[in-house]
Amino acid sequence: MCGRSGLISTAVCPCATGLICQQRICRQPSTYKISVLMQLSEKPGPIGVFDSGYGGLTILHQMRNILPHYDYLYLGDNARAPYGARSFDVVYQFTRQAVIKLFSMGCHLVILACNTVSAKALRSIQQNDLPSLDPNRRVLGIIRPTAECIGSITQSRHVGIVATEGTIKSESYVLEINKLFPDITVTGEPCPMWVPLVENNEYDGPGADYFVKKRIENLMIRDPQIDSIILGCTHYPLLLNKILKYTPRGVKIVPQGEYVSNSLKDYFVRHPDIEAKCTKNGLCHYLTTENTDKFRESAQLFLHERVDVENITLG
């Protein structure tokens, strides 16, 4: 379950969330006009879920399993994906555009269902933008819930992280886990080809075997004592069969969806004011910045169902 807020820096997070406040780079307050505050509806709305691509659908899928009565609005910035190798500032600007869009469509709570976004943009959004956009709305990330749970999973106290280059370079998992569990050794392995394998529907082919085997072997060579591997990218559950194939026997694989969803459930118990602003009709709507036919086809890989989707423009 999600614990109380713990920041990487000494700055205070204005939203006091129980999920993550991750980014280590502070920026100047947003120049976005305070008048936006007056334009946002106070009526309850869906839970916003944002990802740069399709991976966040694995988080959404678990949310709908564990919290099925809520309404969800998923936004995928597929036209500009992947975010993994982009700079902190570019990821922040793209994420800010998405959050503003979801707020304008009635969301009072937005989940950044992307590790790169949670690592590179969350803290700036929380500290610099929410006070002017609407201090009563919330933007939460997905790294903290995973970090909180790993302490009860690892026995050797040696944990591996497989993630995008951006997430690994941010050291968000290392810092968050070490803050919660100083006795745990964390080793990160960047996997730059894994997201393209999923996005191009090649996650079950021979190319996937090559790239997954290479990265898992690299990780285990660097620290043979690892007994738990966190899938630090929401795309990676689709590679689970390949990952299990090349992971040594006895090493646990830790996907994020279940932990993030249970953390959100716990968050609602502790924040009934936010929970009351989330509508409950069991509905889900999808938005994408790319071709809707492509999104619809790719989404079926993650959700195993056909979805209705609307094209939008960000920026």
Positions of the model-derived regions?
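Cysteine-centered motifs
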Residues: 2, 13-15, 21, 26
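Extracellular/periplasmic carbohydrate-active domains that bind, remodel
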Residues: 4-7, 235
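Extended, compositionally biased low-complexity polar/Lys-Gly-rich tracts
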Residues: 25, 29, 139-141
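Non-catalytic structural scaffold of enzyme domains
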Residues: 38-315
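Short, Lys/Arg-enriched N-terminal segments with co-localized hydrophobic residues
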Residues: 27-37
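Acidic, Ala/Val/Gly-enriched low-complexity intrinsically disordered segments
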Residues: 11-12, 16, 36
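Short, low-complexity interaction segments enriched in Ser/Thr/Pro/Gly
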Residues: 5, 17, 30-31
